[in-house]
């Protein structure tokens, strides 16, 4: 199929999904696994008030490894290190805004860090995995919670 490119914007004529990254940080407290989570703001409305891993879109020209650490700081104020790819989720309907391929990274953080909500998050906190369900977690993040619950 012949695709037209644009010399002005650099577009290649392909309609491609966006790439997102999410930071998966966990700790053990009082015999329970807790994950560093944000409570989503009003956009998209389907996820308003639901828990999600801190994350966001990869900027043009940005390495996903840098993006996941940037998003972690922007949304929680927590610095991370050693991002390691945990999962890739890319179902076309996984995000109500548009087709997004999500890269979930395990990220090391200080287990005593005190998250502070930033960017578009309502709140940020360490949340016990046992308190999370499909009803209070945004989108397919519950699948990743299942992965880490079963692995630890």
List the model feature ranges, each with a label:
Residues 36-39:
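Beta-strand scaffold of nucleotide-dependent catalytic cores
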Residues 150-152:
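Helical scaffold of the NTase/Pol beta-like nucleotidyltransferase catalytic core
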Residues 44-49:
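A conserved beta-turn-beta hairpin within the catalytic core of GNAT-like acetyltransferases
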Residues 30, 42, 90:
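Short, glycine/serine-rich, charged loops/turns that create anion-binding
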Residues 33, 57-81, 89-147:
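Unchanged
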Residues 1-30:
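Acidic, metal-coordinating catalytic segment for phosphate/diphosphate chemistry
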